[in-house]
């Protein structure tokens, strides 16, 4: 999620951001589809971002790609449901990985984050992983075509 100004985005940068944040979802599904059909089902869990839902500025290429993840999730769910393949996405808020902390977290940004979240604590990577594990399990057998927000109540 490299920050960038609109005027600084080149076609090369745009394509690279789409490759990193969107393209692989499509081609991964394309490559596993046949074996999932042969196995009479499966589960696909994509990872989106809530940044486009909140209108995050300063990273238009990233937010465009991540909104595309939701579109792909919904299309894949429709196309693959007849083969008993469930497709969902988990849409995290600001997950405070070490990279996020090092690059962008400061006293002001954390104060603003806590002001906007219902749960006044940091969203950590393992919490996102728990949602992915749920959607990967039989406990979510009735869930497909959904994008589940994990953001401590930010949205």
Model features per residue range: what roles?
Residues 5-6, 10-15, 113:
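Substrate-binding pocket helix/loop in short-chain dehydrogenase/reductase
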Residues 9, 55-63, 75:
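Active-site loop-to-helix junction immediately N-terminal to the catalytic Tyr of the SDR YXXXK motif
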Residues 26-29, 41, 122-150:
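C-terminal substrate-recognition "lid" of short-chain dehydrogenase/reductases
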Residues 29, 65, 73:
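Active-site helix of classical SDR
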Residues 34, 78-82, 141:
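Alpha-helical segment proximal to the catalytic Tyr-Lys
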Residues 49:
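Residue(s) in the substrate-gating loop at a strand-loop-helix junction
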Residues 91-102, 155:
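Short, flexible catalytic-loop segment of classical short-chain dehydrogenase/reductase
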């Amino acid at each position: 999620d490299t920050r960038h100004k609109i005027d600084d985005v080149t076609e090369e940068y745009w394509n690279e951001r789409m490759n990193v944040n969107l393209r692989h979802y499509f081609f991964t599904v394309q490559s596993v589809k046949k074996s999932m059909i042969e196995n009479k089902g499966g589960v696909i869990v994509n990872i989106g971002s809530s940044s486009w839902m909140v209108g995050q500025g300063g990273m238009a290429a990233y937010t465009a790609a991540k909104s595309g993840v939701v579109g792909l999730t919904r299309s894949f769910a429709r196309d693959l449901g007849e083969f008993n393949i469930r497709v969902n996405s988990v849409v995290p808020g600001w997950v405070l990985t070490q990279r996020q902390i090092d690059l962008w977290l400061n006293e002001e940004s954390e104060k603003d984050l806590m002001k906007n979240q219902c749960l006044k604590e940091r969203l950590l990577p393992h919490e996102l992983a728990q949602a992915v594990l749920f959607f990967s399990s039989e406990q979510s057998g009735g869930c497909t075509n959904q994008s589940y927000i994990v953001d401590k109540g930010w949205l």
